[in-house]
Amino acid sequence: MKKYILNILIFILFTSLSNSQNLDSLYVSRINDTILSKYLNEKRSIEIQLPRSYEANPDKKYPLMIVLDGDYMFNIVAGSVDYLSYWGDIPENLIVGINQKDTRFKDSSVLDNITHTPITSTASFYDFIVNEVIPYFSKNYRISKFRVILGQERTANFANFFLLKKNPVFQAVISISPKMSKNMNSYLSENLSKTNSKIIYTLSSSKKDFESIYKNVSELKNSLDSINNKNLKFESLIFDEENHYILPSLSVPKSIRSTYSMYSDIDKIEYDSIISNLEISPIDYLTNRYQLIKDFYDEDKTISMNDFMAIEEYIEENEFFDFYNDLSQLAKQEYPGTILPSYYRGRFIEETGDPKKAMYIYRSAYNMKEVKGLTKEYLLELANRIEEDFNY
């Protein structure tokens, strides 16, 4: 068994290092564009970053991430997304930065004196995003149903208004050091506690942030932490030393990674804290995990080899070999025509009392395709070892 676990660990390392291999020969494309808006009565400048694989995968749709304050926030967001997706921690995104250099206040902070919700120019900017920006990209680019909006300070508060609708047009909001308008904390708490939509909300500030912002963020954090709603995924990031202006340089990549935390492969922390203590079938755990990715991100993600190997390690460590049969069926569904289903089927047969049959299964996979981290030579090695051990 030790030999199997050693090989599994090698495979997991291999697949982790291989995440970038499909993207390392591709490059992002940036486009400067304008949208003529009837709501704003002007042309508004936008900057677009296409995913590395956009041209190479003409059938693939990508999450849309809209960056407010794009005149200074676009580069840090676009760079963070490209880096994290390059290593497979998050999916590739189509990034759109909206220039607000001279319009920040009127775009985001003109609010009703009683309800403290958008009016006049800020209501127009809201409609511009909902009725012009999103439809423009739905028509002209391949975007999925999962949309993210990100803002800082005034625009972070503005982004919160999208969560107050019954069916939000954004499924994720990244709110960095928000300058909260009056009633916003109670609005968010009330709406997020009862939302029936899948929502991911990431909030950040710092102890060295402006005092009023840090105070409001802390209060909102405490309120949202107490919400028990399976449709809401909330995380707060409170930094210790960063001031208001430095904060985005740390918060942006961490917030993006938090937004996509369910997307990344199983790591050692998840394995040690959750998988090693499972009270349900590990195959059920794995399929439920990927169903969450579908439910939250609208992404039909193929179960990674890393995650197959993590479940294999669990089976080997605990000697729960019967689970190999179900794992083989799952592998057949995810990697048809490859050696992976035969490998797991062979392990099931070998460990449940028919090594000779397992030997034939390993050898029968020789004409099938290999997968990352698992070779035909390794399966032949398993077959030869059985032949030697039992003198077949």
Predicted regions and their residues:
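A domain-start/cap signature at the N-terminus of enzymes
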Residues: 20-61, 331
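Gly/Ser-rich "nucleophile elbow"/oxyanion-hole loop immediately N-terminal to the catalytic nucleophile
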Residues: 55, 111-152
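Active-site machinery of serine-nucleophile hydrolases
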Residues: 71-126
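Primarily recognizes the serine-hydrolase "nucleophile elbow" in alpha/beta-hydrolase
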Residues: 145-192
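The feature captures the conserved acid-bearing segment of alpha/beta-hydrolase catalytic domains
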Residues: 181-242
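C-terminal catalytic histidine-bearing segment of alpha/beta-hydrolase fold enzymes
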Residues: 228-292, 297-300
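Residue-level recognition of tetratricopeptide repeat
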Residues: 313, 347-350, 381-388
